[in-house]
Regions:
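N-terminal first-folded block
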Residues: 1-32, 36
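C-terminal structural segments of small proteins and small subunits
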Residues: 52-82
């Protein structure tokens, strides 16, 4: 699990059918996660720019989104209260 800050969003006019209607955000891992680059993560919980979030990757991301067959590598699964 990665803790990071949402720094932007991705707009995609065309995407795989099972991803239509989903929002993608750019997450910058916090300093404690040194060595991990920016992540594009699917957001099903309504996170916004500037919020600190929890991100999972791999099969945990697909399961966490309820889309086990979707081509998802990272998903936002929580918003951290400051």
């Amino acid at each position: 699990m990665i803790i990071g800050k949402v720094i932007g969003s991705i707009i995609s006019t065309r995407k795989q059918e099972n991803l239509v209607g989903n929002k993608f955000l750019i997450v910058e891992p916090l300093e404690a996660m040194a060595g991990v680059g920016r992540i594009v993560a699917i957001d099903n919980i309504g996170a916004g720019i500037g919020e600190t979030v929890l991100v999972v990757q791999g099969s945990a991301a697909r399961i966490g989104c309820g889309m086990p067959e979707a081509p998802i590598d990272a998903a936002i699964v929580g918003i951290v209260d400051d």
